[in-house]
Amino acid sequence: MYKRQTHAGWQDRDPAAPVTHISYFEADAFASWAGQRLPTEFEWEAIARGQEGQAPAHDPHEGNQLDEAAPPLPHGSSGLFGDCWQFTRSAYLPYPRFQPAEGAVGEYNGKFMSGQFVLRGASCATARGHSRASYRNFFYPHQRWQFTGLRLAKDI
């Protein structure tokens, strides 16, 4: 069993806890190894809409950490908000028919945004306003972040 060091000494890791601090490439490789795949951002959002509004409350007196996990959905999905940002297989590009507002600096700036993948969900460090099914985060595929993880999808 894996252990982690805490202020109280070495503790067993929770085998049911999400894997975090991984890159897109590692998430995609694991999904392939498991005979599954990463969901598209649209698949992820469709599932998450059933859990939206059930996101755990943030306690401002405890920093910005989530106090508890949202309950599972009827079809069994859980951990969509609060555990970690989950990689999707979708490139971070403008939505179809996106038109920038006049005078906008440009959220989809090719120099800055190119080559990144969409993350969905939220972590314990996510601001409450970003913990929603429609929020799009993004990250470079070769980099790891302590708040990134994965969710698997399977064609049926």
Question: What is the predicted role of each segment?
Answer:
Residues 4-132:
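Functional-site microenvironments in short loops/helix caps that host divalent-cation chemistry
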Residues 145-156:
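Short, structured beta-strand segments at or near domain termini in extracellular proteins/domains
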Residues 1:
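Active-site loops and adjacent core secondary-structure elements that bind or stabilize anionic groups
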Residues 106-111, 137-144:
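Short proline/glycine-enriched turn/loop segments at secondary-structure junctions
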